[in-house]
C-alpha cells in the first residue's frame, strides 16, 4: 500500500469538496432561503470553515504550498460570491416584475 498521498490526488479531493459546497448553494438557488435564511448561511459558513481547515492541514503537511492553499480558498470564495450575486439579482428582477404586474 502506498503510504504517501500525491499532490495531484490531494488537490483533487479538495477541489471535489469545494464543488460540493458550490452544489449546496446551487441546489438552493431557486429558493428564497439562500438570500433570507440565516440557518442556510450558517451551514455555508460551517462548510467554508471546514474546507479552510482541510486546506490548512494539507498545507501544514507540505502537500500544498501556501499559494496553492490560498488559491483554492480564494477561488471557492469568488465562485460563492458570484452565486450569491446571481441569486440576489434574480430576486431583484422577480421583485421588479412583481411590482409592474
Curated annotation (Swiss-Prot):
Superkingdom to which the source organism belongs: Bacteria
SUPFAM superfamilies: EF2458-like
Entries under Gene3D superfamilies matching the protein: SO2669-like
InterPro entries noted in UniProt: UPF0358, UPF0358_sf
Membrane-crossing segments per the record: none
Annotated family: Belongs to the UPF0358 family.
Protein name per its UniProtKB record: UPF0358 protein EF_2458
Organism of provenance: Enterococcus faecalis (strain ATCC 700802 / V583)
Source taxonomy: Bacteria, Bacillati, Bacillota, Bacilli, Lactobacillales
